[in-house]
A protein has these predicted regions:
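Glycine-aromatic micro-motifs
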Residues: 1-129
Length: 129
């Protein structure tokens, strides 16, 4: 799993409390993409010209964790067009230079005039606001 927004450490994680015991923190990582500020949380979209920084986790129970995250992120496997986010497996670059595959929730709605977060790092961005 790759978290780049309010599911990361440092935020109120009550929304993910039901799966915390099934997640094992691996470390920071980055995916190819662009990050935007859409208000209460960020939105990542695939993009070849940038990186989105976040946290990488392993899970001991992928079906249960994905079901919970699908609910949190508004992802409907049977109706992707109406989903707020879409779930995709993506390559994540780890700090040691290795890469891993992880599930990522990409924003699936119009961005409007949302400002791009140039650093791709939501935590860093919030510290500067």
């Amino acid at each position: 799993m790759f978290f780049y927004g309010t599911l990361m450490a440092g935020f109120d994680r009550r929304r993910r409390a039901c799966i915390d015991d099934r997640l094992h923190y691996i470390g920071r990582g980055a995916i190819p993409g662009a990050l935007f500020d859409i208000g209460l949380y960020p939105a990542a979209v695939p993009a070849p010209d940038g990186h989105v920084w976040g946290e990488v986790y392993e899970t001991s129970d992928a079906p249960r964790v994905l079901a919970a995250l699908d609910e949190i992120e508004g992802y409907r496997e049977d109706d992707i067009d109406r989903s707020l986010y879409r779930r995709e497996q993506t390559d994540v670059l780890l700090p040691d230079g290795a890469s891993a595959r992880a599930w990522v929730y990409f924003y699936n709605a119009p961005l409007g005039r949302a400002p791009r977060i140039a650093s791709g790092d939501y935590l860093e961005y919030l510290k500067g606001r």
